[in-house]
Curated annotation (Swiss-Prot):
It comes from Granulibacter bethesdensis (strain ATCC BAA-1260 / CGDNIH1). It is an enzyme of class 4 (lyase). Keywords: 2Fe-2S, Amino-acid biosynthesis, Branched-chain amino acid biosynthesis, Iron, Iron-sulfur, Lyase, Magnesium, Metal-binding. Mg(2+) binds at D81, D123, K124, E491. The gene is ilvD. Binds 1 [2Fe-2S] cluster per subunit. This cluster acts as a Lewis acid cofactor. Belongs to the IlvD/Edd family. This is Dihydroxy-acid dehydratase. SUPFAM superfamilies: IlvD/EDD N-terminal domain-like, LeuD/IlvD-like. Pfam families: ILV_EDD_C, ILVD_EDD_N.
């Protein structure tokens, strides 16, 4: 039987000093012996997805204490990828995931907390906390800040829904006036919450539902809606119950590793493929699986991508559909329900809120539930009022969207495509694999033959695209932007947005050892592994080389003889210290980023740190 960890600091004569310090935080005699629950918040005024979280930690804390626990709140950092985009700030985004995971580990282990509620929301915060939960393996419940409402404005005489990506695209499109660009800018992000499409933040919050670590609705109910408050309150009660089940009943199904098994990771990836989630989720699921000791690899993702259809298309893949529309269609539980009916889900896995995922679906899937309360929950609608206040409105749609033939969520009999929304490609350009969000690729370019136009940084590629260097038929290759080469594996949202604004979105491809924002669409292939900085073939590509991208057959290759590529490799290695480095790029890299680069693995392994790489150099 496991022992409450907190008793290390609260029991015994020799812990008088520690108890004295606990008392200084407000604990009383009756609190010693209760489970100490860490409330891991991520409030910051820098990020719209987190700006409303300030008081929500204490909301959860009050519920924990009402349920018989002791709550102690602390905060992590949170980077806004949209604000960090397009400049050297993006170098810090992915490495911040590791810092978040470490900071949670440090705080929880230093103070011997028994369990935790993770209040996350945006791109690297949910993954960082997820990695920490798997690493620590103490009871944990995730509750996110929720998606923002989609923006709306009149552009060129028509009312349209908007998000962050629209602001980027129209700003680079010279057919829009300054006034029209400003109208889009002012309307694109109207409320608090994570950006309104199926971008990385919302994708990850949805995946916590499939993993079994969050409550139904966590990925889809709006940040502004009063219904979201119930998730925070319930999380506080639930975590105390989970702690008691683990420490008093030795119930492994109350722990993250007991819940997030290999089958649960497959469920999460199947959901991601079905909903056309962000390609970044591949990195984060691989990383979390490693922390959990689960052997989940690119081979598993490739296998799943070949059998799971695309059942949902959300912005950026479908610009008029946002998370509020997914929620109206039954949210993540509805997508999981469709997968389960088709035999594409292991519903026997436990969750934090139900004995099994099957039990959860019986109540929460609108295709099978008889609960009017559940149906009312999924009618939660946007309020249409700009605000930074959580739970500030209670609007309802008149009905839920149950159309599984032409609605937002489709059945497996009526999918958007029989191939899923994500695919893994292999070939001489990416022997260890690379990722493409097929849900965002036009059918006309699923097979693409073009010529390489090579850039050794995102900045150079942006200049080339805006300067007219890139033409129809080009494959824009951006290299030395991987985890080691960047370092930090920048997102390439600006290059893909500018290709769209130049009318090249369906006429060009983009291939990189970097990654893409969840807001990216088009023939955008990232995570090329091995990356240029570790000797990957992408470092040997030259402008003018023929490139084949064949998504149906999962192939990406440089169509050159092996002897030509071998000669280039020999020439590269002859450069000595200058080998596998960008020849013309000037970039200041801080000691913090150099430390990350020294330890990180490539994208095929989740870009996690591997300390043995440093240890081997001693």
């Amino acid at each position: 039987m496991p022992q409450y960890r907190s008793r290390t600091t609260t029991h015994g004569r020799n812990m008088a000093g520690a108890r004295g310090l606990w008392r200084a935080t407000g604990m009383k005699d009756g609190d010693f012996g209760k489970p100490i629950i860490a409330v891991v918040n991520s409030f910051t005024q820098f990020v719209p997805g987190h700006v409303h979280l300030k008081d929500l930690g204490q909301l959860v804390a009050r519920e924990i204490e009402a349920a018989g626990g002791v709550a102690k709140e602390f905060n992590t950092i949170a980077v806004d990828d949209g604000i960090a985009m397009g400049h050297d700030g993006m170098l810090y985004s992915l490495p911040s995931r590791e810092l978040i995971a470490d900071s949670v580990e440090y705080m929880v282990n230093a103070h011997c907390a028994d369990a935790m509620v993770c209040i996350s929301n945006c791109d690297k915060i949910t993954p960082g906390m997820l990695m920490a939960a798997m690493r620590l393996n103490i009871p944990a419940v995730f509750v996110s800040g929720g998606p923002m409402e989609a923006g709306k404005t009149v552009v060129k005489g028509a009312t349209r829904a908007l998000d962050l990506v629209d602001a980027m695209v129209v700003a680079a499109d010279e057919s829009y006036t300054d006034e029209e660009v400003q109208a889009v800018e002012r309307s694109a992000c109207p409320t608090c919450g994570s950006c309104s499409g199926m971008f990385t933040a919302n994708s990850m919050n949805c995946l916590t539902e499939a993993l079994g670590l969050s409550l139904p609705g966590n990925g889809s109910v709006l940040a502004t809606h009063a219904d979201r408050e119930k998730l925070f309150r319930e999380a506080g009660h639930l975590i105390v119950d989970l702690a008691r089940r683990w420490y008093e009943q030795d119930d492994v199904s109350a722990t993250p590793r007991g819940i997030a098994t290999h089958a649960a990771f497959e469920n999460a990836m199947s959901l991601d493929i079905a909903m056309g989630g962000s390609t970044n989720t591949v990195l984060h699921l691989l990383a979390a699986a490693q922390e959990a000791g689960v052997d989940f690899t690119m081979a598993d993702i490739d296998r799943l991508s070949r059998r799971v259809p695309c059942l949902c298309k959300v912005a950026p893949a479908k610009s008029d559909v946002h998370m509020e529309d997914v929620h109206r269609a039954g949210g993540i539980m509805a997508i999981l329900g469709e997968l389960e009916r088709a035999g594409l889900l292991d519903a026997s896995r436990p969750t934090v809120h139900a004995p099994t995922l099957k039990d959860a679906l019986e109540r929460w899937d609108i295709g099978r539930t008889s609960s009017e309360e559940v149906r009312t929950f999924f009618r939660a609608a946007p309020g249409g009022v700009p605000t930074q206040v959580a739970f500030s409105q209670s609007a309802r749609w008149d009905s839920v969207d149950e159309d599984r033939q032409k609605g937002v969520i489709r059945s497996t009999e009526h999918p958007f495509s029989h191939d899923g929304g994500l695919a893994v490609l292999f070939g001489n350009l990416a022997p260890e694999g690379c990722i493409v969000k097929t849900a965002g690729v036009d059918e006309s370019i699923l097979t693409f033959r073009g010529t390489a136009r090579v850039y050794e940084s995102q900045d150079a590629a942006v200049s080339g695209i805006l300067g007219g260097q890139v033409v129809a038929g080009d494959v824009v290759v951006i290299r030395y932007e991987g985890p080691k080469g960047g370092p930090g594996m920048q997102e390439m949202l600006y290059p893909t947005s500018y290709l769209k604004s130049k009318g090249l979105g369906k006429l060009c491809a983009l291939v990189t050892d970097g990654r893409f924002s969840g807001g990216t669409s088009g023939l955008s292939i990232g995570h090329v592994s091995p990356e240029a900085a570790e000797g990957g073939l992408i470092a040997l590509v030259e402008t003018g080389d023929p490139v084949l991208i064949d998504i149906p057959n999962r192939i990406i290759s440089i169509a050159l003889p092996d002897e030509v590529l071998a000669a280039r490799r020999t020439a590269m290695e002859a450069k000595g210290e200058a080998a596998w480095k960008p020849a013309e790029r000037q970039r200041k890299v801080s000691p913090a980023l150099r430390a990350y680069a020294a330890m990180t693995t490539n994208a095929a392994r989740g870009a996690v740190r591997d300390v043995s790489q440093v240890e081997r150099k001693r």
